[in-house]
Amino acid sequence: MDKSAATNSATADGQNEAAAAAAAAATAAGCGSNNSSSTSSSNNTANSNNALQRLATTTSAVVASPMTINLNISTTTGGNFGVSVEPHISVESLKKIIAKKLKVAKDRICLLHREKELQDGTLRDHNLMDGSKIILIPNVETGLLAQRPENTVMQALESLNDAQVNDFLSGKTPLNLSMRLGDHMMLIQLQLSTVNPAGGGAATVAPVAGGASGSSINAAASTTSTVPVMPAGTGCSGANSTSLSSSAVLAAAAAGVGGSTGTSGSGTSSSSSSTSSSSSSSSSSSRTRSSGQRSSGRIGHGHVHSHQHPSLHAANWHGFSHGHGHGHSHGNGHGHHHHHHHHHHHHHHHHNASAVAAGSGGGMSSLRKMYGDLPSSSGASGSAPATGTGQSQSSSTLNGPDLTKLLIKGGIQNIVNSFALKDAGANARPVANGGSGSSPGKPVLEQSPIKSLSNLVSSPIKMTTIKNIPLPTTAATSSSSSCNCSSAAPSSSSSTSSGACATGGCQQDPIAAKLTSCLCTRLPTPSVAPPVATLVAPAPVARSGSTSSPSKCPESSCSGANAGFAARSTLAGTRVTFSGNSMLHKTGNNRITRTKHRHYHGQGHGHGHGNGHSSSSSSSSSSSSSHFFNHACAGNQPSVNAAAFATSSSSSSSSPSSSSSSPSKRRKLEQGMGAGAVGATAATATAAATVALPASTSATTAEPDDSLLGVSDTRTLAEASRNLTQTLRKLSKEVFTNKIDLSGAGVVSSGRSSSSGATSSGAASGEEAPRKSGSGAVIESMKNHGKGIYSGTFSGTLNPALQDRFGRPKRDISTVIHILNDLLSATPQYGRGARISFEAPTTGSVSGSGSGSGSSGSSSTTSSGSGLHHGSRSKMYSSKHHNCAKCNSRAQQQQQQSATLASGSGGSCSFRDCPSYHSSSAATKASTSSKSSSHSCCQTAEAPSSMTSQSNGCTCRYRRDDGQGEREREHTCQKCTVELANMKTRSKMDQLRLVMQQHKQKREARKLKSGPYATAASASAADSLSSIAAGGTAAVPMGAAAQYSAVSALVATPLQPAAVPVQTGKAAPANSITGNSSNANVNGNTSTAPATAATSAAAAPTAAPPSEVSPNHIVEEVDTAA
């Protein structure tokens, strides 16, 4: 860390050098291929590695200040370790630190110093100084020891020190909590995507220099181990990690460092991405997860290198980034190719063109050219690729200068020039970066590393960036998207991006517009690339939420959107409020984006974001994203959608192959991957998206409740803590009873998304609503890692109540509880209105957008269309709380629409507002309930007309005497009578269906238990995935059946031939099931059979029943699939 810090402070040149070294190290560590790619890298490898290792080993605390002292702790069992602490901390804090390091309860530890037990006071009081030796002896209790009670969240939090809490709240490092619930442990990793500018900057810069810390910020989740990798990836990983947002990060980080994939850098990256994507639930799973998440993640590994190769020196950086970005561990051998592809993807993601070019094979030169053409690209390339997610971009941006320098050194002056030329481009990039991790922030803050870049960016973005960074930046993830976007937009779809941007709303923000124009200008070449990008992109998309969006975008307007993102990010920085929405966008960071978001929706931009976030952004974006997908990728659409899914999931992994293959194939692959990643995918997408979102939200996970409650309020805190403990218990029970809900519990990645969906849903302000809808954003990426390890990612936006006036999370441990609480509460099951749903656009394209959740479910699209006047439908759903006529009628419409949608294909099923309903039914129900009490509270007696309108032409008359909500009906018109009867029947049917579903679920669970684990799991996952993929095309009613059947089918025929195209899934629920499952299987073959199968299966059911499928079911499936 110190080294890294030193590096940071070093001169720009030195820093670049360092960055190069880091990159090299990363490369070296992560991917051997990289080494060859760049000589300079190689030399540096050693020190960069060193730094990485240091980083990996040191904890965030170490990063702390130079004022720390090192204490040598020797245990009675012979293990020795050192801790670096500040001399003024209390003995209790030291015990907490040690307890956390050893993962034991602090009351079980006894510290002796000079034969004296340390009990209270500060370290200074006991004359502890640098190098002091402390003997650690365990407290042993004799006698009958009752089963230790479950740890409460409070106890878990007590073991945290202020530095950890502050680092978490500032987005620097993820917060890891371990809780014991009955006989199993739950590891929770929370990551805020937000970083304060300093942090953000650090993230990028650090990555460059030491990489660890900066990345860490970005990656946050990936912080320690990931971080190291990150540095290599420099921004990439970071981005990913950011994306990871946390859960995955943890595991991923470890894995990454280890090089879970063989390539350490890559691994890390992958872990980070994977983390991002899914948030690995446990560390071990995390690695897996990460790879699964990003199945492609694996690819990424190889990728990384490969990427580098293609670009040559540029690639080198590229590779790094890429690799990181990819962070996949994709096969190493594959790696090369994949690399390429991935690279492209990333690139493309980043800069389509460049990616594409790279993809082509002539990639190197192309890339170079592209780079030249697209500074952004180059930046991206340098780091975007790494991140592949956007983050990389940001990294790249951050690194941009370094990159540039490297590249320049390498002979890619073009890039540099472009960078220089394209201030805007740089700007955008930084913005993206900012999003990404605050790279902008860093540059802004710390110019030396990226002087040139920062100069480019600094003026316009400086503020924004900083601002962004704090909130948006946090959007690292987001930003990654942003980054991606920005780069990607430019590169990937420069043309698109410009067009999109312009149309989309880039223009809305001047900065965005500028960025866009820069991007556009910058990426003229890419215009050609887009298709390729598209092709490839989907995979990348999968790879990283953000990336994916770019990739998608390129197809259509993604990049525009992305660009918008980037721009947005920048702007957004200023607006905290948008965080929820922002989340949606990759650039969720951008405050602005939020608004834009909506815009984009319309534009189709969303889709880019959507993808990335598809799940995550879940609602707003997702719905838009679905649209987007639709629009934007009309041609590629299917693949895109799939990609979106996959992307989130891990299409990347398939991406390489798929990239080469046709889009549809890729799509399938992706799907498969998704499936593999499935939980991951959905989760991933979500996760990544989520992450991104979260990033945007400064404290991504605040819960509406929190917002409602005064954070400082002790009573609230106690309650929040209790709720949280209960929720966790529920989660863990569910997980272990095969009903994993999102949580899987294993990891609760920050709950950014949770809010985010809501926000996106438009209820940006009403925390409650957002939360509700936001839960939709919850990513359900639960995977089951072997024996009882599950991971789930939740994300949401930070509740405004938890933010200080700069939009940063309040510095207080209680904030953590509230964040966690909201996160979890937002999950569909627990959250009042939460819904996870992947909703298909009306067109029926199956996009990963699923975001019914944000949108509130039932038809997110619908809902957005109808535009509840309350941003969140979910609120509407609970008509009890809120029955205004407007809402009611809206609800009605909505419900109708949603029904049609659902049945139509549009199926936007949402994960029910009401726990186990399809949203449409829920909506119906809600509306019916409101209707039946149609005289809503808000209506006054004299408002029969409004009543009428509300009931769609009902002519009932009410007496006016009754001032309360329930007016007596004087005369009920026929229409209402019929309606009421229908309602009743419908609700009865729904209930029946629900009961049946539950029975069926139980049966399935039993079957799954008896069957071989993998198959069952995959089937399940597939199930949910396919439904998701299907986008709820099937009629809602069919949904449940479809889902189930899908599951059974899957179980029965896990490896159907892949003859059926994925599209089928989209097209018809039944088909989709079959087709999907077969696809999934196919995919599975390619990458993770079970997972894939799961995915496809999942896709099919989801398609049909997203709304119907109970959250558990889906989650369960996901887990299993994973």
From Swiss-Prot:
Biological classification of the source: Eukaryota, Metazoa, Ecdysozoa, Arthropoda, Hexapoda
GO cellular component, one term: nucleoplasm
Region Required for interaction with Pc, annotated ranges: 210-300
Compartment list: Nucleus
Domain Ubiquitin-like: 69-143
PANTHER family: MIDNOLIN
Keyword terms of this UniProt record: Nucleus
Compositional bias segments (type: Basic residues): 300-310, 321-352, 596-610
Domain notes: The ubiquitin-like domain is required for Pc degradation.
Entry protein name: Midnolin homolog
Mutant lacking the gene: phenotype: Homozygous and hemizygous lethal at the pupal stage. Hemizygous escapers display haltere-to-wing and metathoracic-to-mesothoracic leg transformations and die as pharate adults.
Gene3D superfamilies reported in the protein's UniProt record: Phosphatidylinositol 3-kinase Catalytic Subunit, Chain A, domain 1
Biological process terms in GO annotation: proteasomal ubiquitin-independent protein catabolic process
